[in-house]
């Protein structure tokens, strides 16, 4: 074995090698970065009524589930729907004649909501050490004025009506301006205080809001493979939401109109997962990514129509290969007893074997691409990817394109520098240049991306010795 020794001055604050990712996606990880994860598959289907001959055993295929496949009191997940959680203000089915808890967020009682929400959280998650995913599912209204189109336009209309009643002598321009600000302020208070409550009560859970980030549904129709710049701006403007989240829950659901379009579905799913990773990198590097999907196109009306293998490849398989934290398979409880046999047959004959095949291919990639020392992942979506299309997230202390190097701490010298002196050393002699920062977001955005990363520089203090062994 050939040993190459290199002395590098690295500030004591870093202690061990920091995470460095080069332009082709290869990484090395020191103790200051988390270990690479394998993608879990979570069964968020309320199939607990399925018993006896129709009992559904998902664990034999490596799928995680709550105990007895219940939605309450489990260890893997908890989900809170606006209709039965706290006192969320909304118009039922966006109908102004059926306001719930005030209808508009501006008219809701935040304190009453938080008091009831605390009871609901403690009931649904009795374990104070719960470390699963906690999903806040509020879909009746959207937390931003610019996202309130289509059926959600009612919240704009009613906000303007409310402002006009409060300030009848204002001009229409003043009324519309204030209505937008008032609506967004109320939305942010409800969303932020709710997730803060959850984090305070169950601090180990991964908290976030379902359906965010978002992407335009027509991506791919004009040969593009990314979410539009408009939707990227929408997501950038939700920086206040990302600042409070510890998990991101995008949805790659397919519907009956998608049945015969697996290629289009692949582009859609890949674009949203890529956009979610962009949000994570720019705004919440500590957030986990849990992608929601289904296995039925419409479990309400056609429960016997399940995803084809091509559409499994466009959703679940792609998310696993892009190495998200988990893929969450969701379904409704409606008519669940009559659907038990259908679910069991699909699980045993299609979904389960498909997941096993994906797992075997990813294990082969780990061994051959990453030398068994890290996780394979696709940096970007690609149909029928070859081994060389994958990159590696290496287990510490390994690093390199194929996790072929091993880093070892030898010692320290002198005192710890001040945080302002902290720099990542230039090790370009051994690695390709780091990938460009994503912090340069358009000045037209309402918010600027925070600087989450250190810049390389020559102003380094006394550091430690690093031995690189190949």
Which residue ranges define each predicted feature?
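Alpha-helical scaffolding within the catalytic cores
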Residues: 64-65, 120, 226-239, 270-280, ...
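Aromatic- and acid-rich polysaccharide-binding/catalytic face
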Residues: 75-77, 81-90, 94, 140, ...
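Aromatic-lined carbohydrate-recognition surfaces of secreted/lumenal glycan-active proteins
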Residues: 175-234, 284-298
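Extracellular cysteine-rich, disulfide-stabilized repeat modules
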Residues: 376-378, 382-396
């Amino acid at each position: 074995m050939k040993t190459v020794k290199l002395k590098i001055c690295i500030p004591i604050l870093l202690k061990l090698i920091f995470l460095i990712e080069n332009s082709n996606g290869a990484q090395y990880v020191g103790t200051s970065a988390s270990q690479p994860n394998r993608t879990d598959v979570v069964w968020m289907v309320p199939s607990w009524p399925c018993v006896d001959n129709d009992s559904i055993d998902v664990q034999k295929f490596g799928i995680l589930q709550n105990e007895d496949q219940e939605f309450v009191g489990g260890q893997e997940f908890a989900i809170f729907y606006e209709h039965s959680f706290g006192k969320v203000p909304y118009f039922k089915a966006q109908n102004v004649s059926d306001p719930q808890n005030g209808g508009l967020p501006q008219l809701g009682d935040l304190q009453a909501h938080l008091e009831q929400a605390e009871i609901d959280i403690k009931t649904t998650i009795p374990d104070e050490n719960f470390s699963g995913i906690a999903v806040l599912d509020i879909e009746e209204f959207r937390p931003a004025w610019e996202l309130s189109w289509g059926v959600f336009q009612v919240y704009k209309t009613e906000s303007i009506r409310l402002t006009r009643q409060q300030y009848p002598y204002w001009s229409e321009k003043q009324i519309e301006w204030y209505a937008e600000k008032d609506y967004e302020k109320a939305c942010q208070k409800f969303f932020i205080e709710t997730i803060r409550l959850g984090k305070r009560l169950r601090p180990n859970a991964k908290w976030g809001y379902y359906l965010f980030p978002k992407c335009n549904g027509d991506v791919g129709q004009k040969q593009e493979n990314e979410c539009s710049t408009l939707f990227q701006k929408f997501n950038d403007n939700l920086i206040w939401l990302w600042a409070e989240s510890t998990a991101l829950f995008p949805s790659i659901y397919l519907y009956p109109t998608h049945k015969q379009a697996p290629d289009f579905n692949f582009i859609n799913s890949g674009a949203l997962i890529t956009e979610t990773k962009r949000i994570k990198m720019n705004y919440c590097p500590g957030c986990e990514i849990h992608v929601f999907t289904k296995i039925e196109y419409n479990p309400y009306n056609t429960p016997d129509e399940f995803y084809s293998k091509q559409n499994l490849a466009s959703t679940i398989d792609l998310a696993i290969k892009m190495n998200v934290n988990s893929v969450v398979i969701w379904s409704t409880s409606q008519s669940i007893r009559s659907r038990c046999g259908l679910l069991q047959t699909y699980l045993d004959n299609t979904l389960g074997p498909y997941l096993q095949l994906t797992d075997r291919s990813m294990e082969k990639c780990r061994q051959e691409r990453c030398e068994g020392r890290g996780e394979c992942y696709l940096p970007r979506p690609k149909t029928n990817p070859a081994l060389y299309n994958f990159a590696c997230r290496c287990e510490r202390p390994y690093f390199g394109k194929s996790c072929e190097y091993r880093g070892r701490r030898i010692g320290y010298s002198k005192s710890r520098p001040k945080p302002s002196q902290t720099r990542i050393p230039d090790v370009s002699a051994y690695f390709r240049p780091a990938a460009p920062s994503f912090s340069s977001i358009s000045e037209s955005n309402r918010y600027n991306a925070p600087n989450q990363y250190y810049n390389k520089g020559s102003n380094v203090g006394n550091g430690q010795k690093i031995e690189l062994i190949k």
